[in-house]
């Protein structure tokens, strides 16, 4: 009854109004499951290829009819008759059919949509929650949310070079209490920004994008909002930054164009040490450019035992790159984005590889999201302990938080929320 009898692809829209792919998988039992894939704004050079049509007369070239057609023809022909319960085989068949290193033939968006829809169909067929199907009986850890409340860089039209300033609520002993803490700070932040005369329009990920002029100003405003919301920085709430530094790195001259200056990797490391010493920063993502491997080695040596150093563009959820990074001793954490690698099996391989090496995992959304909540289940399934899924506004972000609330309720007394303990290897 778990045999796949039909697969359909369709072109739908993401949270930025750009086309994306939805896949629908039908099983012999009558189960119908769908999955939608997201899209990023700042992308690593080694990410799997998101197949776009390039027809400037449709959606300014961003249509995905080619990827949809690949689902409706090549992938459907390949997988109809296969068992949805054999996820590894399903994904392997698609990867073999594609035949490229970066999935440029079928498109990572086509492969991933089908991969996720098959997993969801299998869970429905077995009548168990998706997180339980993916993670087994020990899937029970609710993630600490890293909430992007101030946007800069490629996510905003302001003077902030760093892309994301996040609050990390570790308060309350339960996910729902930590989320409440984060939401209350978000609303307080809005008031703080208004009182200072700043705009409170929200960006792609639901955070504010005020015309702030420096990293220090952004962090000071966050500290103020945390205190005014009634919480203690460093105890109830930690801070995190996504520098997305590849975006302001001059590859030729090997300098970072940051806040009007040209800085070396050593200068950036000094900057991070100063920030970490002044504010309750627990995590820095993409602190240096994906090509600056020597810089990454120095950064890891300087701060790797004090804070979480997350590789996003550095690793692009690619097991081969993660393995190489582990061998070189760079970073200590992996940002996990399903569409960077383009299949569920490879994503789970990446997560496991990081765990074995004692690297932390942060499950992540993309800036162009959908209403699909797969990453919420993935976070619990893998006991990752952390999730990045935006601020406390925009339905595409809130959908993931709401799914996590449901999962925590369903798990009842078995649910685990580690809070500050999620960072025990860094907090002495």
UniProtKB/Swiss-Prot annotation:
Protein name per the record: Enolase
For this chain's UniProt record, which GO biological process terms are given?
A: glycolytic process
Q: Which residues bind (2R)-2-phosphoglycerate?
A: 163, 337, 366-367, 388
Q: Relate the protein's function as given in its record.
A: Catalyzes the reversible conversion of 2-phosphoglycerate (2-PG) into phosphoenolpyruvate (PEP). It is essential for the degradation of carbohydrates via glycolysis.
Chain's gene name? eno
* Reactions listed under catalytic activity: (2R)-2-phosphoglycerate = phosphoenolpyruvate + H2O
Taxonomic classification: Bacteria, Pseudomonadati, Aquificota, Aquificia, Aquificales
Provide the E.C. number(s) assigned to this enzyme.
Answer: 4.2.1.11
Q: Name one GO molecular function term.
A: phosphopyruvate hydratase activity
Cite the annotated pathway.
Carbohydrate degradation; glycolysis; pyruvate from D-glyceraldehyde 3-phosphate: step 4/5
Q: Which GO terms describe its cellular component?
A: cell surface; extracellular region; phosphopyruvate hydratase complex
């Amino acid at each position: 009854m778990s045999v796949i009898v039909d697969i359909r692809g369709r072109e739908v829209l993401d949270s930025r109004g750009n086309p994306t792919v939805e896949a629908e998988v039908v099983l012999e039992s009558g189960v119908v499951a769908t999955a939608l894939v997201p899209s990023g704004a700042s992308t690593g050079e080694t990410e799997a290829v998101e197949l776009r049509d390039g027809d400037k007369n449709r959606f300014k070239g961003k249509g995905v009819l080619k990827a949809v057609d690949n689902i409706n023809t090549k992938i459907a022909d390949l997988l109809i008759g296969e068992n949805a319960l054999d996820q590894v085989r399903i994904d392997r068949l698609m990867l073999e059919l594609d035949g490229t290193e970066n999935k440029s033939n079928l498109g990572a968006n086509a492969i991933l949509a089908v991969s996720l829809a098959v997993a969801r169909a299998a869970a429905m067929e077995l009548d168990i929650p998706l997180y339980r199907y993916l993670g087994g009986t020990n899937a029970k850890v609710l993630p600490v949310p890293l909430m992007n409340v101030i946007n800069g860089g490629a996510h905003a039209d302001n003077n902030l070079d760093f892309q994301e300033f996040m609050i990390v609520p570790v308060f309350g002993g339960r996910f729902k209490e930590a989320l409440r803490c984060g939401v209350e700070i978000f609303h307080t932040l809005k008031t703080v920004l208004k009182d200072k005369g700043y705009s409170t329009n929200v960006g792609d990920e639901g955070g504010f994008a005020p015309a702030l002029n420096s990293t220090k100003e952004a962090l000071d405003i966050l500290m103020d909002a945390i205190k005014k919301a009634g919480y203690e920085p460093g105890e109830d709430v930690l801070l995190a930054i996504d520098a997305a530094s590849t975006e302001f790195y001059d590859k030729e001259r090997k300098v970072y164009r940051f806040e009007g200056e040209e800085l070396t990797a050593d200068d950036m490391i000094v900057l991070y040490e100063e920030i970490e010493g002044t504010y309750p920063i627990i995590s820095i993502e993409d602190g240096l450019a994906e090509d600056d491997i020597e810089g990454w080695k120095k950064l890891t040596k300087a701060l790797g035992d004090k804070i979480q150093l997350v590789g996003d563009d550095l690793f692009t959820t690619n097991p081969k790159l993660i393995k190489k990074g582990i061998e070189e001793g760079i970073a200590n954490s992996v940002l996990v984005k399903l569409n960077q690698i383009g299949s569920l099996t490879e994503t789970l391989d990446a997560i496991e590889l990081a765990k074995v090496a004692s690297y932390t995992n942060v499950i992540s959304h993309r800036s162009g999201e959908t209403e699909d909540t797969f990453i919420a289940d993935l976070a619990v399934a893998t006991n990752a302990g952390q999730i990045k899924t935006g601020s406390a506004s925009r339905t595409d972000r809130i959908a993931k938080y709401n799914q996590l609330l449901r999962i925590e309720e369903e798990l009842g007394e078995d649910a685990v929320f580690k809070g500050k303990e999620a960072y025990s290897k860094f907090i002495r």
